[in-house]
Amino acid sequence: MLSCFRLLSRHISPSLASLRPVRCCFALPLRWAPGRPLDPRQIAPRRPLAAAASSRDPTGPAAGPSRVRQNFHPDSEAAINRQINLELYASYVYLSMAYYFSRDDVALNNFSRYFLHQSREETEHAEKLMRLQNQRGGRIRLQDIKKPEQDDWESGLHAMECALLLEKNVNQSLLELHALASDKGDPHLCDFLETYYLNEQVKSIKELGDHVHNLVKMGAPDAGLAEYLFDTHTLGNENKQN
């Protein structure tokens, strides 16, 4: 083994042999030039990323008081964060529905497009509330999003019934948020909810109620062609308009 090392060392140039092994790590580049000694103060500390994150100054901008906050009650701020979570949950449920109906053994593609559109709308609702939170000087506190209660949505009628119940729950939460804003004397939040949410929720509930009624009249889910015809004609025309 020693003889092999001596043999190889004869073929290594003096410049390469003088190199020292280098360890890889996340560190800032050193300001160094040949013939100039290294300054220990220039060497970046090698710390794990988690330790670096935990050592941030807690008095930074995120933890400081807002300069724009006015007439914005902490209860309203917390309720908006809960509403954001509910809107994202609704988007999650609709996303599950959308990709269930695009499965090869279901193949109701207009149901899929309809629920995908609903999912994107719910995400937009959540983002709009996030923008409001920042505008009012609140702090966004995201929470875990609960998974949908089922993965197999059985039929178009069952999915529409679940969507109707979901929209009613979202609407009830918005009504409670509006009542809270009114109780705390926050006309801006009341106007925001009335302008962008409450009227749209009523329209969505009416639309889903109509879809459930028409599917039942057509004999879904027992009649084999009912959901196919509803998918092709009713939802197909709606998706073209959207």
From Swiss-Prot:
Broad class of the protein's primary localization: mitochondrion
A GO-annotated cellular component: cytoplasm
One GO MF term: ferric iron binding
Keywords for the protein's UniProt record, in alphabetical order: Iron, Iron storage, Metal-binding, Mitochondrion, Oxidoreductase, Transit peptide
Reactions catalysed, as given in the entry: 4 Fe(2+) + O2 + 4 H(+) = 4 Fe(3+) + 2 H2O
Binding site for Fe cation 2: E122, E167, Q201
EC numbers on record: 1.16.3.1
Protein name: Ferritin, mitochondrial
